[in-house]
Amino acid sequence: MLKKEDRAMGYVENIEELIEGLKFDENGLIPCVVQQHDTGEVLMVAWMNRESIKLTVETKTTWFWSRSRHELWNKGAISGNIQQVIELYSDCDNDTLLAKVDSPGPACHTGSRTCFFNKLV
């Protein structure tokens, strides 16, 4: 059982229970919006499965499921720009996640700080 101060630090007592309340798509995936915790800047959107959520909660770093490579990946593990998870939320329908992170460098594979740089309107 976790102590009160552990819960206040964001530790999760039962990861399975947390995951069971989420709504995954037919492929077992759920979208996750990644946001810089202190500025509110939206950095990227990626997909998570049950295992990547567990790893994210356990390691306090972002883990995602690559739909193209069909494998788990720890964001920033290769570039060194590992995203530290500050908070993780689900939306009102429990079908989308929001990870508030501290992202030390570019979040986009193009080298841009954010993946959202193609202004449409």
Which residue ranges define each predicted feature?
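C-terminal binding/interaction regions
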Residues: L2-L29, Q36-L43, M48-V121
